[in-house]
Amino acid sequence: MASLKEDIVIQLQRISTICKLKAPVVVVWCMTYNHANYIKDALDGFVTQIASFPFIVIVHDDASSDKTSEIVREYGEKYPDIISPIIETENQYSKSDGSLDYIMKAAIKATGAKYIAMCEGDDYWTDPLKLQKQVDFLEANPEYGMIYTKIQRFYQASGKLKEIWGGNHESFSDLLRENTIPTLSVLIIRDIFIDYQKEIKPEIRDWKMGDYPLWLYVSAKSRIKFLSKVTGVYR
């Protein structure tokens, strides 16, 4: 993998500086690409979170060709304590050289946050207490490494919210039979996530199953909690 471009290094340094002062408990990782029609829903879901602790949202725009980056910058300027953009000038996903994973890990590490949440730019959260509920549970139950919830599916063709999905598997054996975990609903302990990256190295594997291997890893290393609440929408 080539070294990071200077502009990305500068953006990561900015995030590190902010987090040294802010000391966020949660970092939210949001990847977006050509989501101009949807990204405001995601960003609004972040900035309306009500939490008793500091959190930061890193929005990685992978060189969108529409107005996604402009919208992300606008929110970054309006909510500088919450939204921290990383704006690419060339698409990292298409390189398939591990650059995107490296940037994600570097950004998450720079925050020093205890927990990680994820939500892509075309999905969004609907529960303003999502993070608070999940952090409260994990803080009170240290034997758990991750918590997830239900979500609702949105069908673009009809413009309607339809079935509710997610849960209720919590054990390795149950999850091995079926993945019932929506990524946008998850809160995970950062140290477990980092251990997974170091030990499993998903970036070098040609897996076509999203975050499913991560859920299996977490369930093998700790306990997973399913919270039977709808907290977001998947498009």
Name each model feature, range by range.
Residues 116:
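Short aromatic/hydrophobic "clamp" motif used to bind/position activated sugar donors
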Residues 128-161:
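Conserved donor NDP-sugar-binding/catalytic core segment of glycosyltransferases
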Residues 24-27, 56, 213:
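Cell-envelope/extracellular polymer assembly enzymes that use nucleotide-activated donors
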Residues 40, 66-75:
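Acidic helix N-cap motif at the loop->helix transition within catalytic regions
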Residues 61-70, 90-91, 120:
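A conserved acidic beta->alpha catalytic loop
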